[in-house]
């Protein structure tokens, strides 16, 4: 999906509770991959008002002469996504969706590198194949990447085979550029269904949602984004931001303000292991 198309679709969505799956949680994921029960409900995030028409974008087959890919380890089928991380101390996790984007992602990576911080990037397959060097940079700098589908569709409006194609093609593209298959998956718009959980588990991916939505996808202004992060900061919080899908210049400027503030406040910004 092109940038203007994704932005138009986002504007069709309401900021509300992620009622299609992110309202509860499968547990909190520890930096080492453990779990604990009873996490809090998710903060408001981008939510679908109605199912848009299926994308006309056709998934591009990935071809090559390399060895066959190893079958992923099957996981437990969740019924709700993870919303937070667990562990002792003031730990938080930063996540960025919809990229990589050559205009905004490099600036975000530069800021993270400046403060020696690692983050999670949930990538769209069509962006991965167009920006392989950015995905390689994420791997080199220790960031963890996840699967965010190929064209960013509303999964609840797709047939099961269409969901599988979106997810499988994206995992293949990520492996080609990142060097490893993703072990985390995030549904576009936070709209989960049973098929997404089942297919993700079959592909060796755990579902990850978020605790605090920066609302940067609405371009609310830098000060609003900064306030959302700083007021929502708490141990275990997973922050949702975007590095693509529209004008993300506010996101780029905002992270330069709130990231040093979080670090000065004693927070440790962590990521799950690259291999669970």
PLM region spans:
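A general, composition-driven signal for non-globular sequence regions
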Residues: 3-5, 142, 180, 236
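Catalytic domains of cell-wall/extracellular-matrix polysaccharide-remodeling enzymes
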Residues: 107, 129, 153-268, 272-276
